[in-house]
Every structure is written in structure tokens, then in C-alpha cells.
């Protein structure tokens, strides 16, 4: 099983209820496609290093998952790419040495 860290930034002008729905939707996508959510963190609203789509802030969410295949991460990336609410995302595979400790 491989461990991944998924980080995504939600646009800052979203309503609180809509933000919660987006977080539940994307975390649910990861969980429903055969991965186990190890940890989910909401970092809140933070300033971006540079503007993205005319936004200088965004809501950061970080999720650590464990999965046997890439189905969950592929589906997450596909849906995040077409979502207007997610302004940036990245999926990183953690080193196996780090996860074994």
C-alpha cells in the first residue's frame, strides 16, 4: 500500500456551507475509491505565495491517504481539474522509508 499526501486549495470567496460541502465531496471521493483516509487537516484561510486566478488567499486542506492503486488519486485529480471551487491541488507520493517508521 502506498501513502499519498493530497493538498488542495479552495477559493476564498466561497460560503462556509459550500466550503464544507466541497471538503466532504473531495475527501469522500478519495475514501470511496478504495483508499483509506489516514488524516485530514483543514489549515484554514492562508495567503498564497502568488495570485492564482486573481485570488491572493485560499482555504488549504491536506489529506493523507493509503491506497493500493492510483484509482482514488486519479479520480480526485480529474474532478479537481474541472471544479471551479478548487483553485490548485497537488498529489504527492510519500517515500516508503518515511511511512515505515
UniProtKB/Swiss-Prot annotation:
Coiled coil: none annotated. One of its GO terms (biological process) is translation. InterPro entries: Ribosomal_bS6, Ribosomal_bS6_CS, Ribosomal_bS6_sf, Ribosomal_S6_plastid/chlpt, Transl_elong_EF1B/ribsomal_bS6. Keywords: Ribonucleoprotein, Ribosomal protein, RNA-binding, rRNA-binding. GO terms for molecular function: small ribosomal subunit rRNA binding; structural constituent of ribosome. GO terms for cellular component: cytoplasm; ribonucleoprotein complex; ribosome. HAMAP family: Ribosomal_bS6. Belongs to the bacterial ribosomal protein bS6 family. Binds together with bS18 to 16S ribosomal RNA. This is Small ribosomal subunit protein bS6. It comes from Staphylococcus saprophyticus subsp. saprophyticus (strain ATCC 15305 / DSM 20229 / NCIMB 8711 / NCTC 7292 / S-41). The lineage of its organism: Bacteria, Bacillati, Bacillota, Bacilli, Bacillales.
Amino acid at each position: 500500500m502506498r501513502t499519498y499526501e493530497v493538498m488542495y486549495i479552495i477559493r476564498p470567496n466561497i460560503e462556509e456551507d459550500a466550503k464544507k460541502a466541497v471538503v466532504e465531496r473531495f475527501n469522500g471521493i478519495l475514501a470511496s475509491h478504495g483508499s483509506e483516509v489516514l488524516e485530514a487537516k483543514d489549515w484554514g484561510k492562508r495567503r498564497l505565495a502568488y495570485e492564482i486566478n486573481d485570488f491572493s488567499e485560499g482555504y488549504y486542506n491536506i489529506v493523507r491517504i493509503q491506497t493500493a492503486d492510483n484509482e482514488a488519486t486519479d479520480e480526485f485529480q480529474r474532478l479537481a481539474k474541472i471544479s471551479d471551487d478548487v483553485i490548485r491541488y497537488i498529489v504527492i507520493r510519500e517515500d516508503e522509508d518515511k511511512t515505515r517508521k
